[in-house]
């Protein structure tokens, strides 16, 4: 059975979300390609929102 590769943009989004939950800066985006970078930043924004709304404001 052939394994299917994960969508690169979905992976970038997830990595950005997780980076925000860990309190990393958006300047730490590891992607050079524009589309992947935009997805990473979108995930980062969502993660930052989740980070602040879940009562974790003290760690920012």
Swiss-Prot record:
Gene3D superfamilies per record: ribosome modulation factor like domain
Domain of life: Bacteria
GO cellular component: cytoplasm
Cellular localization per UniProt: Cytoplasm
Primary localisation category: cytoplasm
Keywords per UniProt: Cytoplasm, Translation regulation
Biological process terms in GO annotation: regulation of translation
Annotated family: Belongs to the ribosome modulation factor family.
UniProt-listed HAMAP family: RMF (MF_00919)
Task of the protein: During stationary phase, converts 70S ribosomes to an inactive dimeric form (100S ribosomes).
Protein name, per record: Ribosome modulation factor
Originating organism: Kangiella koreensis (strain DSM 16069 / JCM 12317 / KCTC 12182 / SW-125)
Gene: rmf
